Amino acid sequence: MSTNEEFAGKVALVTGSSSGIGEETARRLSALGATVVVNSAQSVEAGEAVAAALPGTAVYIRADISNQDEAHGLIDATVERFGQLDFLINNAGWTTEVPHDQLDDLTDEIFRKTFDVNVFGTWWLTKRAIPHLRKSDDPNIVNITSIAGVRPVGSSMAYSMTKAALNQMTLLLAKSYGPIRVNAVAPGLVATPWTKDWDALH
């Protein structure tokens, strides 16, 4: 394993990392020498398999970040296990495909669930993590947002709105919480198990 001095000895929590972007992020961080916490709300076996396959030190911790207690518990468990937190990668998200011109299909239940995971979950994790990140000599928060947060695209209006909220959250945190580095990555549509059936969006 070829490590990188910047990541050696660091602890990274990657939410929603049992597949897709989160999994690849966890793999890359581990390959660079970071200790990685893999997380998912479901797909427990997949998450455990990802952690087991990583080249460096890694564990899997199940938590549903749309539940405040579980989100807080995920941060607490990470710090209790490894004594520190240096990188928080807020990747976990949820959506379902609802065409933008079919508002009647965008139910309050869908709207709330999308915000609970994508916005509230990210907020709860970040707020809980900041006191620990302040103790790090290289603290980082990376929010995985989406091109849907800045353009009229995306799987649903609710999803796009949550990603716009995360973009603004990123700017405000970056301005207010230095020297913690806070950045957002806003990819377009990525081929993952989650999007494989979204023919209309491809």
Go through the PLM ranges and name each one:
Residues 99-103, 107-112:
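Substrate-binding pocket helix/loop in short-chain dehydrogenase/reductase
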Residues 131, 174-178:
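Alpha-helical segment proximal to the catalytic Tyr-Lys
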Residues 32-49:
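Conserved glycine-rich Rossmann-like NAD(P)H-binding loop of the short-chain dehydrogenase/reductase
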